[in-house]
Curated annotation (Swiss-Prot):
Gene name tied to this protein: CML17
Residues the entry annotates as binding Ca(2+) 1: D17, D19, D21, R23, E28
PANTHER family to which the protein is assigned, alphabetical: EF-HAND CALCIUM-BINDING DOMAIN CONTAINING PROTEIN (PTHR10891)
Protein's name in the database: Probable calcium-binding protein CML17
Record keyword rRNA processing present: no
Residues annotated to bind Ca(2+) 3: D101, N103, D105, E112
Originating organism: Oryza sativa subsp. japonica (Rice)
Signal peptide: none
Residues annotated to bind Ca(2+) 2: D53, N55, D57, C59, E64
Ranges for domain EF-hand: 4-39, 40-75, 88-123, 126-161
Protein purpose: Potential calcium sensor.
Xref: SMART domains: EFh
Keywords: Calcium, Metal-binding, Repeat
Single GO molecular function: calcium ion binding
């Protein structure tokens, strides 16, 4: 994994690791997902953590988080196989897009981006100017909004690259 990908992954991990102890607890994961508007059932969350938690401590550390990322990237990366992984990838991308597209109009606006970033406690999105710059970095057609295609391209190129 490239250094910039490792740094990006570390930033994402730290967003979920609210107390900064180097482990994402079930509570931290629940809280982060709820802030994104993605409530998860306890059983589903427990199963997810059990799949990720290689050392069995009930939490997700940076190594386990990295392993999960690498596994997802191998599945997403294409390379043959049936269409199943692509369908899951598309559905996951749509679900993530819908978190940001709060009014459901098919676009992520400056205000919507700001609201989601604020709910996550991300400082870089505190002003409309910051959010406008972030959107400008991925807005291919120049309409001042991010559509689903632009969102997918951004996610495949590095989901949090605009937060630097």
């Amino acid at each position: 994994m490239a250094c910039d990908q490792q740094a990006e992954l570390r930033r994402v991990f730290e967003l979920f690791d609210r107390d900064g102890d180097g482990r994402i607890t079930r509570e931290e994961l629940t809280e982060s997902l709820e802030r994104l508007g993605m409530p998860v059932h306890r059983e589903e969350l427990a199963a997810t953590i059990a799949r990720i938690d290689a050392n069995g401590d009930g939490c997700v550390d940076m190594d386990e988080f990295t392993q999960l990322y690498e596994t997802v990237m191998r599945v997403d990366g294409g390379g043959g196989g049936g269409g199943g992984a692509c369908d899951v990838d598309e559905a996951s991308m749509r679900e993530a897009f819908d978190v940001f597209d709060r009014n459901g109009d098919g676009f992520i606006t400056v205000d919507e981006l700001g609201a989601v970033l604020a709910s996550l406690g991300i400082k870089q999105g505190r002003t409309a100017e910051d959010c406008g710059r972030m959107i400008g970095q991925v807005d291919r057609d120049g309409d001042g909004r991010v559509d689903f295609l632009e969102f997918k391209q951004m996610m495949r190129g590095g989901a949090f690259a605009t937060l630097r």
